């Protein structure tokens, strides 16, 4: 089916272009969401009549989207979740969680505007793209951690797989175990010469 695009559609075309798409995509997505018109002679004439209005509305919406993008751009969102010692989350961080975190900061975006390939299932940082307008995109950094302290350590770039206190305790335990099993250290403590 041929359609006339009423706005820019990613990987398809710009506003005003006549493109050929599959019937299901046209009916279920483009026409339903008023992103396109069927490319009939009547609709082509109708589009030419409303072209100036559509372009003016697009420029206005793009300007508003640019203002919102400035607020969002480079923002760091922290999401606290329970996770195993290996960093696997007990659950996941989805688009809904990102939208809710932005809403808590006073920024309103809808779920379809957040582009997340798959839910986040591990602790760490991930860049997420937000398309506020078909021509305006920005990104945020989502930091997933077990606690606020751990989130700060992740932001600083520290290795969070093991804590520094745990590494120090392990080194002390190895040193103590080495003395415990060293026969010379045991004999010196007992005051006896080493038997050979």
Swiss-Prot record:
<dbReference type="InterPro" id="IPR036935">
    <property type="entry name" value="Ribosomal_bL9_N_sf"/>
</dbReference>
<dbReference type="GO" id="GO:1990904">
    <property type="term" value="C:ribonucleoprotein complex"/>
</dbReference>
<dbReference type="GO" id="GO:0019843">
    <property type="term" value="F:rRNA binding"/>
</dbReference>
<dbReference type="InterPro" id="IPR020069">
    <property type="entry name" value="Ribosomal_bL9_C"/>
</dbReference>
<dbReference type="GO" id="GO:0005840">
    <property type="term" value="C:ribosome"/>
</dbReference>
<dbReference type="InterPro" id="IPR009027">
    <property type="entry name" value="Ribosomal_bL9/RNase_H1_N"/>
</dbReference>
<protein>
    <recommendedName>
        <fullName>Large ribosomal subunit protein bL9</fullName>
    </recommendedName>
</protein>
<keyword id="KW-0699">rRNA-binding</keyword>
<dbReference type="InterPro" id="IPR000244">
    <property type="entry name" value="Ribosomal_bL9"/>
</dbReference>
<dbReference type="Pfam" id="PF03948">
    <property type="entry name" value="Ribosomal_L9_C"/>
</dbReference>
<dbReference type="InterPro" id="IPR020594">
    <property type="entry name" value="Ribosomal_bL9_bac/chp"/>
</dbReference>
<keyword id="KW-0694">RNA-binding</keyword>
<dbReference type="GO" id="GO:0006412">
    <property type="term" value="P:translation"/>
</dbReference>
<comment type="function">
    <text>Binds to the 23S rRNA.</text>
</comment>
<dbReference type="Pfam" id="PF01281">
    <property type="entry name" value="Ribosomal_L9_N"/>
</dbReference>
<dbReference type="GO" id="GO:0003735">
    <property type="term" value="F:structural constituent of ribosome"/>
</dbReference>
<dbReference type="InterPro" id="IPR036791">
    <property type="entry name" value="Ribosomal_bL9_C_sf"/>
</dbReference>
<keyword id="KW-0689">Ribosomal protein</keyword>
<dbReference type="InterPro" id="IPR020070">
    <property type="entry name" value="Ribosomal_bL9_N"/>
</dbReference>
<keyword id="KW-0687">Ribonucleoprotein</keyword>
<comment type="similarity">
    <text>Belongs to the bacterial ribosomal protein bL9 family.</text>
</comment>
């Amino acid at each position: 089916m041929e359609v006339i695009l009423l706005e820019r559609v990613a990987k398809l075309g710009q506003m005003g272009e006549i493109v050929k798409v599959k019937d299901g995509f046209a009916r279920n997505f483009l026409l339903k969401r008023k992103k396109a018109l069927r490319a009939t002679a009547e609709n082509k004439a109708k589009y030419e009549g409303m072209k100036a209005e559509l372009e003016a509305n697009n420029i206005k919406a793009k300007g508003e989207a640019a203002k919102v993008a400035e607020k969002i751009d480079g923002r760091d969102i922290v999401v606290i979740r329970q996770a195993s010692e290996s960093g696997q989350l007990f659950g996941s961080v989805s688009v809904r969680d990102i939208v809710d975190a932005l809403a808590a900061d006073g920024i309103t975006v809808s779920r379809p505007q957040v582009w997340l390939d798959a839910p986040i299932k591990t602790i760490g940082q991930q860049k997420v793209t937000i398309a506020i307008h078909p021509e305006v995109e920005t990104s945020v950094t989502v930091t997933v951690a077990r606690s606020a302290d751990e989130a700060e350590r992740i932001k600083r770039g520290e290795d969070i797989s093991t804590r520094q206190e745990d590494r120090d305790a392990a080194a002390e335990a190895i040193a103590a175990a080495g003395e415990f099993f060293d026969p010379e250290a045991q004999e010196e403590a007992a005051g006896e010469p080493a038997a050979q």
